[in-house]
Amino acid sequence: MKYKDLRDFVGRLETIGELRRISQTVSPVLEMTELCDRVLRAGGPALLFESKAQHAFPVLGNLFGTPRRVALGMGVDAQAGEGDGAALESLRDVGRLLSALKEPEPPKGLKDAGKLLSLAKAVWDMAPKTVSAPPCQEIVWEGNDVDLARLPIQTCWPGDAGPLITWGLTVTKGPNKPRQNLGIYRQQLIGRNKLIMRWLAHRGGALDFREFALQNPGKPYPVAVVLGADPATILGAVTPVPDTLSEYQFAGLLRGGRTELAKCLTPGVDGLQVPARAEIVLEGFIYPQEGAPSPAPAGAPPRPVKGASAAYEHALEGPYGDHTGYYNEQEWFPVFTVERITMRRDAIYHSTYTGKPPDEPAVLGVALNEVFVPLLQKQFTEITDFYLPPEGCSYRMAIVQMKKSYPGHAKRVMFGVWSFLRQFMYTKFIVVVDEDVNIRDWKEVIWAITTRIDPARDTVLVDRTPIDYLDFASPVAGLGSKMGLDATNKWPGETDREWGRPIVMDAAVKQRIDSLWNELGL
């Protein structure tokens, strides 16, 4: 189903009972987090906080708080009563589309060639289009009117350093790339028009910024932040879209209609384009540092001094409660100065919180897991299923089910998964099992680990690999180890002993007891 903007999606969710309006006053300082967290853990609806007692904007939370709503946002019309299972299965179709876009199969005949041409035409037809007089610029704040405190920016946890923008789609462009990049990076409010842009070094926005700083030293770097885009654009920004395809174009494929874009209004930022029907847009720059920077506070990490981007204004970010369930360490990141804010009339502020799983990012991880499966299966045909348990912070542990064909096969799959997609670079643990193990059932996974693993033989340890900066368990920030566990049945060459034979009841006996079951009343 097509959703032309966030409001269209909100209306659809309300119609099918997936959204609840909250008229009571709920503060964006801690209270919204507590309420959203309780509702999400109960599998409840999205929440629209309508009271304007504290701010002039309604706040939308828990938008993607269930896999079904993620599927709906991706254009899959999950029917009422189907539950999350049906929605997850339908998301594999999105993965198959991505797989075809990432590595198209060579045509084996006229029929295949026709399908390939149809796909290419579909991608071509979804090229974004620029519109004039966009709704996202119905209201414009400039000069002293630009005050981020006028927005209902959440403070999520008691130990947070301050208010935090959590669902902003950051739009950047590198000097050597034709397409714009969309990324979601949290942004700490530190002044009337200043935010800290927390993007890690490997993320698209940080790479664009670094390339710009190298080629344009001393020049301000333009950035736009979108708050409240249509669901296809939001989800396109968190999906592993091939580098040759823009997130806007992929959003068009999900939506079934071209993404309408608008040029930013601020001179110097007008080379960036944002969704024309977005609720709120922040336009501005990351400016070069003027004068000598103030010294780092006692006990804080040192300021960045290496690289062209170090010459730009930075600030100490955090601590904040994160998706790990802990407060993260402080670190230096660039400062984004907002020069102009544009918005729709009666704009909606879209927000979320992160915390110990399950939270909204964990739900997104469960849904995107199904998108990953076809991508992995195309590269590794032996993989029969793949699961990122949400308890593992969505990506730190992966369980792989495979059809094993030779000794050492499981180890090959481990290294393949670690190296295949950027999304798995930070996966610390991989457990590989056979086809007879349901990888979504912890009881079966633990059974396989405890009965099919010899720790010395079946454990793979890899030291000094890229690791999540937020992973305080690693000895060095951003660098740590990985573990692979081969919980498959062992083949000759992997063991000298006779391997165990699983206990299975006779099929005729099972059928006989099935026929008696209702009579027994057990």
Curated annotation (Swiss-Prot):
Binding locations of Mn(2+): 181, 247
Pathway, per record: Cofactor biosynthesis; ubiquinone biosynthesis
The protein's Enzyme Commission number: 4.1.1.98
Active-site residues, Swiss-Prot/TrEMBL: 322
UniProt keyword annotations, A-Z: Cell membrane, Decarboxylase, Flavoprotein, FMN, Lyase, Manganese, Membrane, Metal-binding, Ubiquinone biosynthesis
GO molecular function: 3-octaprenyl-4-hydroxybenzoate carboxy-lyase activity; metal ion binding
Cofactor(s) for this UniProt protein: prenylated FMN; Mn(2+)
Complex and partners: Homohexamer.
Family: Belongs to the UbiD family.
Protein name: 3-octaprenyl-4-hydroxybenzoate carboxy-lyase
